């Protein structure tokens, strides 16, 4: 059973999740799960805006059970629970109720959400027809503040596991004004968009981190503060160290627009002259070949490109990938030369 499940990828992109929410969140409640910093909250707000719904949010870590069920007041000989205004506004119009960090809620708070998630009710009060109920949170493996969810809660929602899609994010980044150098960097190194959550609580690269870094650069530049030193401080304060060091080195060398990797194959003269920039492009080409994206090149193009490089750079590209380059038609003589260089 586990092997069968492993053959399928149940995770979907933010764009796919948004369409599902807009399609059926008025009847079925959703729980969005992913690593921190993917942009779940922004996606929910965007989905609600597009549907013309106001979005009201509750942060799971900052509420108590009575914040959900309401507080009692005496009416005649009976006690009546008064629901909170954020969950049940005076005007009976549909809205988007966003329950952020639901998996981080205390067990009593999770129980208070049962009828809200399944029946769209707060005690004797029903949510306005057409109201969305969407929750979000992190997973146990993300080293975030997460509590075990009860089976009763899980059975009341549709759980959507989310994954990062680089093309999707780049389109969003262009629409929202993310800086060109950040978009170029992520285009060249897609893995830099979302790094694994580190074991220690240190900065790491996520879509949110890149977006906030772009905004920080804009503010620093507007105030005349953006230089090499402040760029490094801001980048290392937001990103994974391996991304921050390469990003800053490229920015300081003013590499300019990064060409499609196919262009460097066909026109090696386009490779940047600066050491950091050249190493960066060659590392991207190495990944390009490893992923099988260079399979369409003719052997003469491959060999012309390799011969244009120094022995050191050739060794960098071919190390541990002799079979890959051999399948592309790289000359045997080049491999012999590299063996001599490596043995020297």
Q: Where are the regions that the model predicts?
A:
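AAA+ P-loop NTPase catalytic core and its hallmark functional loops
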Residues: 1-189
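AAA+ P-loop NTPase catalytic core
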Residues: 1-65, 250-344
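A residue-identity detector for tryptophan
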Residues: 132, 169-172, 210, 279, ...
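Intrinsically disordered regions, especially transient/low-confidence alpha-helical propensity segments
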Residues: 166-169, 207, 276, 322
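Alpha-helical lid/collar subdomain of P-loop NTPases
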Residues: 175-316
């Amino acid at each position: 059973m586990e092997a069968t499940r492993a053959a399928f990828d149940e995770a979907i992109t933010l764009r796919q999740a948004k369409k599902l929410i807009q399609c059926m969140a008025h009847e079925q409640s959703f729980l969005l799960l992913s690593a921190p910093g993917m942009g779940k909250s922004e996606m929910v707000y965007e989905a609600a805006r597009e549907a013309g719904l106001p979005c009201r949010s509750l942060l799971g870590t900052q509420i108590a059970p009575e914040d959900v069920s309401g507080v009692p007041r005496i009416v005649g000989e009976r006690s009546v629970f008064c629901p909170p205004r954020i969950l049940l506004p005076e005007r009976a119009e549909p809205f988007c109720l966003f329950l952020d960090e639901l998996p981080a809620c205390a067990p009593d708070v999770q129980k208070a959400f049962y009828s809200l998630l399944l029946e769209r009710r707060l005690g004797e009060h029903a949510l306005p027809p057409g109201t969305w109920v969407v929750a979000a949170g992190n997973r146990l493996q993300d080293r975030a503040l997460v509590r075990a969810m009860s089976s009763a809660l899980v059975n009341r929602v549709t759980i959507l596991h989310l994954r990062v899609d680089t093309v999707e994010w780049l389109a969003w980044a262009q629409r929202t004004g993310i800086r060109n150098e950040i978009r170029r960097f992520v285009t060249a190194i897609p893995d830099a968009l979302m790094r694994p959550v580190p074991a220690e609580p240190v900065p790491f690269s996520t879509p949110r981190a890149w977006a906030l870094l772009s905004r920080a650069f804009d503010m620093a530049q507007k105030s005349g503060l953006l230089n090499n030193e402040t760029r490094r401080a801001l980048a290392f304060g937001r990103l994974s160290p391996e991304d921050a060091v390469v990003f800053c080195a490229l920015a300081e060398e003013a590499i300019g627009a990064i060409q499609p990797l196919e262009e460097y194959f066909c026109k090696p003269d386009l490779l940047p002259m600066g050491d950091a920039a050249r190493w960066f492009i060659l590392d991207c080409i190495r990944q390009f070949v490893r992923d099988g994206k260079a399979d369409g090149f003719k052997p003469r193009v491959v060999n012309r490109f390799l011969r244009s490089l120094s022995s050191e750079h050739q060794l960098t590209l071919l190390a541990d990938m002799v079979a890959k380059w051999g399948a592309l038609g790289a000359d045997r003589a080049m491999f012999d030369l590299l063996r001599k260089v490596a043995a020297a």
